[in-house]
């Protein structure tokens, strides 16, 4: 009796180990992909539409095929023993993940191919756009255009320089203008020209105006000659 129990326990443990090994191999194939999928399986995938979403029979959430298998293996490991295959709609009495990987492994091949095709097509389109931009930019540079030359962003003002500029004394131009106008008025009053003398005394006769102009010229010449003589000394 004891020997029979021991033999039963050993046989059950060996069968459990074999089942665990099969599950591990199936999951390894699940994550690595099936590179040896046959053409008949690929045709089955194309006929059924491998890119559709699969509804989890336990929680009702939608997944793609790979995500569905991972979800069932992680979240519904116990319920999967009596689950229904979402692909062939048959009631499975064994591990659902094992059934999916063994009977419908061509789905993995198709999804892997589609992912590679999407990545390659996206990379090709991106490279095409980059080549087009580079070609257009080179043409614009050759023609002297500036459509591809962006203006550099305005640099932020240095706070130290801003404070230094604000602290500098501001010149007062009004005082300088006032001093210049005062000097000009002094010179005009001291040495009036002919037109100023004529406008200042319009009531004088023409003869008097000429004499006044001559005297003013004489005085100016005398003053200038005196200044030049002082400089020569």
Curated annotation (Swiss-Prot):
One Pfam entry name: Di19_C
Region (Disordered): 176-215
Bias (Basic and acidic residues): 191-214
InterPro entries: DI19, Di19_C, Di19_Zn-bd
Membrane-spanning intervals of the chain: none
Domain of life according to the entry: Eukaryota
Family the UniProt entry places it in: Belongs to the Di19 family.
PANTHER family linked: PROTEIN DEHYDRATION-INDUCED 19, PROTEIN DEHYDRATION-INDUCED 19-RELATED
Name by which UniProt lists this protein: Protein DEHYDRATION-INDUCED 19 homolog 2
Species per Swiss-Prot/TrEMBL record: Oryza sativa subsp. japonica
């Amino acid at each position: 009796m004891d020997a029979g129990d021991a033999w039963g326990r050993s046989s059950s443990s060996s069968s459990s180990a074999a089942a665990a090994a099969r599950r591990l191999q199936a999951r390894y194939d699940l994550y690595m992909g099936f590179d040896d999928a046959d053409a008949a399986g690929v045709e089955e995938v194309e006929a059924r539409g491998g890119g559709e979403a699969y509804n989890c029979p336990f929680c009702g959430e939608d997944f793609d095929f790979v995500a569905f298998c991972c979800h069932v293996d992680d979240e519904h490991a116990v319920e999967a023993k009596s689950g229904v295959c979402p692909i062939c709609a048959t009631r499975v009495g064994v591990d659902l993940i094992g059934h999916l990987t063994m009977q419908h492994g061509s789905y993995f091949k198709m999804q892997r191919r589609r992912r590679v095709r999407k990545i390659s097509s996206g990379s090709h389109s991106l490279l095409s756009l980059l080549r087009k931009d580079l070609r257009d930019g080179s043409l614009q540079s050759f023609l002297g255009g500036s459509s591809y030359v962006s203006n550099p962003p305005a640099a932020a003002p240095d706070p130290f320089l801003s404070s230094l500029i604000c602290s500098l004394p501001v010149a007062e131009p009004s005082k300088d203008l006032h001093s210049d106008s005062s000097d000009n008025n002094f010179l005009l009053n001291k040495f009036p020209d002919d037109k100023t003398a004529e406008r200042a005394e319009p009531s004088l006769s023409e003869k008097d105006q000429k004499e006044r102009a001559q005297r003013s010229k004489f005085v100016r010449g005398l003053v200038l000659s005196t200044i030049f003589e002082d400089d020569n000394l």
